[in-house]
Amino acid sequence: MMKLVIALCLIGISAAYVVPVYYEIYPEDATFDEADIEPQLSPAELHHGSIRERRSLQPGAPSFPMPGSQLPTSVSGNVEKQGRNTIATIDAQHKTDRYDVRGTWTKVVDGPGRSKPNFRIGGSYRW
């Protein structure tokens, strides 16, 4: 269950940092029939709606996590190979001028040192 919560948190954070791609609603080479064109509406008859913008990780989009972010919270993940073991690490921290909080989740996911996950949580408060 904990793996699912962590995976969903990472998906949510990555979706928040993705840049939307704008597509042209009416391209220049499109053709319209005269029967399909709607008459002009008065301001009282206007209908307001929104178009959902698609998100994309295309070139030019900011990297994750965003460098130089002004947010006090940061989350980072890492998968590395140490000898024959593969270790996954997720680190989250929140820093303000009054306190610091940090949490780390580590697990050997593959190899002879395979084990249950380790958790570390710590904090400090400045008077």
Swiss-Prot record:
<dbReference type="Pfam" id="PF06286">
    <property type="entry name" value="Coleoptericin"/>
</dbReference>
<dbReference type="GO" id="GO:0005576">
    <property type="term" value="C:extracellular region"/>
</dbReference>
<feature type="region of interest" description="Disordered">
    <location>
        <begin position="43"/>
        <end position="84"/>
    </location>
</feature>
<feature type="compositionally biased region" description="Basic and acidic residues">
    <location>
        <begin position="45"/>
        <end position="56"/>
    </location>
</feature>
<protein>
    <recommendedName>
        <fullName>Holotricin-2</fullName>
    </recommendedName>
</protein>
<dbReference type="GO" id="GO:0042742">
    <property type="term" value="P:defense response to bacterium"/>
</dbReference>
<keyword id="KW-0399">Innate immunity</keyword>
<dbReference type="InterPro" id="IPR009382">
    <property type="entry name" value="Coleoptericin"/>
</dbReference>
<keyword id="KW-0391">Immunity</keyword>
<comment type="similarity">
    <text>Belongs to the coleoptericin family.</text>
</comment>
<feature type="compositionally biased region" description="Polar residues">
    <location>
        <begin position="70"/>
        <end position="84"/>
    </location>
</feature>
<keyword id="KW-0044">Antibiotic</keyword>
<comment type="function">
    <text>Antibacterial activity against Gram-negative bacteria but not against Gram-positive bacteria.</text>
</comment>
<keyword id="KW-0732">Signal</keyword>
<keyword id="KW-0929">Antimicrobial</keyword>
<feature type="signal peptide">
    <location>
        <begin position="1"/>
        <end position="15"/>
    </location>
</feature>
<keyword id="KW-0964">Secreted</keyword>
<dbReference type="GO" id="GO:0045087">
    <property type="term" value="P:innate immune response"/>
</dbReference>
<feature type="propeptide">
    <location>
        <begin position="16"/>
        <end position="55"/>
    </location>
</feature>
<keyword id="KW-0165">Cleavage on pair of basic residues</keyword>
